[in-house]
Amino acid sequence: MTDKTHNNDLTGPVPGNAGVEASIENMEAMGLDPENLDMILNGTVEGLMSDYPALRTDDTADMMISKARSLIGTVVEYEELRMMYACALKEIKAKFDVLNTEFKVRYSRNPISFINTRLKKTVSISEKLGRKNLAFSVENIEKHINDVAGIRVICSYVDDIYAIEEALLKQSDVVLVCRKDYISAPKPNGYRSLHLIVKIPVHFAEHKREMKVEVQIRTIAMDFWASLEHQLKYKQEIAMQEEIVEELRQCADIINMTDERMMNIRHRIEAGTKAPTEDELMFEKLCKLDINLE
């Protein structure tokens, strides 16, 4: 079944009362205040009528109220879009959970330490569109914002990052849109991580929708460095900021060397382990029957 189409033209058809009431009931969940929105819409109409008495006609008032209601219709569409991105996060997280469980059974260890997901806040989406000189609309969000839905996968070792990436991209329903490897080519400030933009299908009750998700894969050490650097980025007027930036960059290099050494030590341990006997292999298989898959 084809995707539902959306109309964001403020002069387009006005949603029914049921749709408007439903959107108002759910606005608080979106971080919007329905009372404030109602005041803004009513105030806009009344303010224009007061400033321009010639506009005070039934036809003009109806037209302006129609546009205001259409704006609420756009909010309804935006709410639906956020729901679809939230579902996309559930789908992509399930894929990583399955891979982690498989690795645990096949290789007796989990390459993924933990997973975080997030939906970009409305104000952040609006600011990003503004920087691109784009209007706030469902179409612009889908076309120009790649990181509305984001998932961060934290691994123990650097080679786990690429193993997880390879396993994900082998899946037939995962389409790679963009890849940026900041591990092999770090940012000037020392930031390291693997970034992917992928498209995955999400099946809803009446249609299927291809949704974009930003995937960040990094080690535990890369992640705690990035968390501290993120704090610095959004703090204003920090004393000795240049010195802190330089020290963070140096720490990034040290963390990278530590990640490499830890991975090499693991490889040496694995290489130095003697080949198991047939009885040991059988015992290991029996133990795996009781493995905790949670």
Task: Please identify what each model-predicted range represents.
Residues 133-138, 150, 161-162, 184:
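Accessory alpha/beta interaction modules
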Residues 142, 155-264:
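Long beta-strand-rich cores associated with HINT superfamily self-processing modules
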Residues 37, 41-89, 96-102, 213-294:
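An acidic, glycine-/histidine-flanked metal-binding catalytic module
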Residues 71-81, 110-119, 145-147, 203-216:
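Short charge-dense sequence patches
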Residues 79-125, 130-140, 147:
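Active-site acidic/histidine clusters and adjacent loop/turn architecture
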Residues 148-154:
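Terminal, regulation- and interaction-focused segments at domain boundaries
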Residues 4-55:
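Intrinsically disordered, low-complexity terminal tails and inter-domain linkers enriched
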